[in-house]
Amino acid sequence: MAPLSSMMNSLQGPLSQEGKLQERKSDKEDAQSNDKAAVKGCKGKALSLPFSVESLISDRTSSRTLYTSSEAGIISPTSGADERLKLSPMALYADRKIPVESVSNLSDCKRGDMEELSDKGQSGWFQTTSYTSPPRHSSPPPCTLRKHKNNRKPRTPFTTSQLLALERKFRQKQYLSIAERAEFSNSLNLTETQVKIWFQNRRAKAKRLQEAELEKLKLATKPLLPAFAFPFPLGTHVGSPPLYGPSSSFPRPALPVPGLFGGPVTYGMYYLS
């Protein structure tokens, strides 16, 4: 008997393990079928709502078929009003008679989806975005002024006596020869280059002054209005009939005024210099 009982126990051990595995598989299949049924129920509820995308599309297709059928014949106003009442959201809601529980369940499903999307969006925002300061443009370099050469000699001002002597010599002769310039520079204790440059500057100044004087003379001689003259001298009879009184065929002698007008008079206006 003892060996038979041990044999039975050894056979019952693997059988019990196989039964447990089958029970676990059946439990998993039941859970998956329940999840699929819940998802299908949510989708069916979403499809049954009057304001869902599918219901709106179906309403549009029905209204289009009505319009196409109305093009074939004339629809009476009463029938059009009836169709509008039938297609109104309130009528659709009353016809379908959607229970309140399905609406609440669908709203819960939509809220859960919106929360998941918002959580994903916030996590992506915090992960991807990072504040970076805009790059600053470097300030432009300061304007560098032109510097004089280092080997340039300092400017030495002329004395009053030297200026008077140079001006007197310039009035006598504007261009000096090499010998005259050497002798004149030695007499004033100046270099030939200084005398040469002074004469060049003085000639340029004299040219500018001369051009300014010529411009003034042009403005002074230019009249403001063009001069005009009478076509006949004053004091002569033109032969026009008198304005008042009877006309006579004899010419009326003019009385000349001695010393007043001897010829044609011209008038002109000029600028005052």
From Swiss-Prot:
Coiled coil: none annotated. Residues 1-41, 114-159 are annotated as: Disordered. It is found in: Nucleus. Residues 145-155 have a biased composition (Basic residues). Residues 1-15, 120-136 have a biased composition (Polar residues). Keywords: Developmental protein, DNA-binding, Homeobox, Nucleus. One of its GO terms (cellular component) is nucleus. One of its GO terms (molecular function) is DNA-binding transcription factor activity, RNA polymerase II-specific. Residues 20-33 have a biased composition (Basic and acidic residues). The keyword Glycosyltransferase does not apply. Pfam families: Homeodomain. It comes from the Eukaryota. PROSITE patterns: HOMEOBOX_1 (PS00027), HOMEOBOX_2 (PS50071). The keyword Nucleus applies. Residues 151-210 bind DNA. Belongs to the Msh homeobox family. This is Homeobox protein MSH-C. The gene is msxc.
